[in-house]
Amino acid sequence: MSEIKYKRILLKISGEALAGEAHRGLDFEIVNSVCRVIQKCVDAGVQLGLVIGGGNFWRGVKDGADKMQRSHGDAMGMLATVMNAIAVADALEKHGMDARVLSAVEMNKFCEYFTRDTADRYLNEGKVVIFAAGTGNPYFSTDTGAVLRGVEIEADAILMAKNVDGIYSADPNVDPTAVKFDTLTYDEVLARHLKATDTTAMTLAMDNHMTLVCFALKDPENIYRVVCGQTIGTIVKED
């Protein structure tokens, strides 16, 4: 078994990545493949917190643009993350793991209310903790929510599993000359306006000296490779 580099992680998975080619809803083949890798990490002794976006059901900014009040659209987006969290918790339990959903918004019939101490206790007990409902406030992305939870649980690293395999100098889908970076500093990402995540999330990570790893979820084994310190995607850290 490979040596573990990051003992406690916050893994952020985009909702779209779990939707597969349908781009909406959940592709349970993908969900189960991710669960198997999470199980591999947990079996290796990794304490794992998880944030899942809601874009496979609803994207507040995009789907609600010019159609509804922004805070209402964001509320729907937060509820979408709860749907994903419940589904993934169910899948994790079917794989033999103990999972808990902690929501930033109280909804006691569906999941527990988040507190930092509850999350820390569950992680120390070996449970997978899924953080739902973002920050509980509109105008903040799930990426920002993921960084916030990563800071709160004192994660060794925040792993951003997305549909792109790292951070590029430009959009690789538009610019064929775009170059992928192996490592960057937070200052470089912000100064170059690179599309790693939103500025709020990036600044929060920088201010709290977090290591951020951006990589593709296309091969879920990348999660375990990153945990073991392999060079996958792009690492963002301090100078």
Identify the residue ranges that each predicted region occupies.
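C-terminal catalytic "cap/lid" subdomain
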Residues: 1-239
